[in-house]
Design a protein with these regions (language model features):
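Active-site-adjacent beta->alpha loops and helix N-cap segments on the catalytic face
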Residues: 2-9, 24, 48-60, 66-79, ...
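Conserved, mostly hydrophobic/aromatic
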Residues: 17, 34, 42-45, 108, ...
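Catalytic cores of alpha/beta
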Residues: 26-36, 102-103, 150-162, 201, ...
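Glycine-rich phosphate-binding active-site loops on the catalytic face of alpha/beta enzymes
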Residues: 40-51, 111-125, 167-177, 204, ...
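Hydrophobic alpha-helical segments and helix pairs
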Residues: 82-126
Length: 246
């Protein structure tokens, strides 16, 4: 199968936004507003009852989606419904294994996604990484890997040699927490290990100064999720939310 490439997104610094597929607050106008105002890649989360590395905001988003009747099939119907420059799918390997990893890849391909990210893969299931890489090739995806600064340097270098679309570096242990002052140093070290592989940073970014800090340290882009979900689910007026999203 021909390879789907996200390389076009990385001709400049990248903004990737996380949204939960099927969260009642993730309406079409939210996605359209974000798309019109500079979001390069949309990362759609597949709701699961056990989002073990997410903070309270995204866990609540998953819960809303599940309680509203969202299923695996409905999640991908939601994703398929939007024509966007770039979109990827995020879910946990633990969940993907329970439904069938190949089934997940097939759904992602049919929904027009350009990759599948499994944040717990290298943390909890590193022995299955070769299966993930093989299925990515089978379905025409470049692999995407999630790492943290606590990963062994040798492993990070090995992951970069697998030619991923990008590497997503989690800055904190869970989403939505505060950034420590050592972040810039960690980003610089990781970037030196992966050479030309694009590096996106996320898990705790909510303010413009944090974005600048990551970019200055060498990141090729940032991922914002919890801050946006808090905004759209906070009960504000639609026009005010639109202005904030811009």
């Amino acid at each position: 199968m021909a390879m789907v490439s996200l390389s076009g997104a990385f001709r400049k610094r990248v903004l990737m936004v996380y949204l939960t597929a099927g969260d009642p607050y993730v309406d079409s106008w939210v996605i359209e507003t974000l798309s019109e105002h500079g979001v390069d890649i949309f990362e759609f989360g597949i709701p699961t009852a056990r989002p073990k590395y997410d903070g309270l905001t995204i866990k609540a988003s998953y819960r809303r989606a599940i309680e509203s009747g969202v299923t695996l099939e409905k999640s991908f119907q939601f994703i398929e419904g939007f024509r966007l420059r770039h979109k990827v799918v995020l879910t946990y390997f633990e969940y993907a294994r329970s439904i069938g990893l190949e089934r997940l890849m097939s759904y992602a391909l049919n929904a027009g996604a350009e990759g599948v990210l499994l944040p717990d893969l290298l943390i909890d299931y590193s022995e299955d990484a070769d299966v993930y890489v093989r299925l990515c090739k089978q379905y025409g995806f470049e692999p995407i890997f999630f790492i943290t600064s606590s990963f062994p340097y040798k492993l990070i270098s090995e992951v970069a040699r697998l030619n991923p679309a990008f590497i997503y570096m989690g800055l904190m242990a869970s989403t939505g927490t505060l950034l420590p002052i050592t972040i810039s140093r960690n980003i610089s070290i990781i970037k030196s290990l992966i050479n030309n592989t694009p590096l996106l940073t996320g898990f705790a970014i909510s303010e413009p100064k944090q974005v600048l800090e990551c970019i200055r340290a060498g990141a090729d882009g940032v991922v914002i999720g919890s801050a946006i979900i808090r905004l759209i689910s906070g009960g504000g007026e639609k026009q005010h939310i639109k202005e904030e999203l811009r």
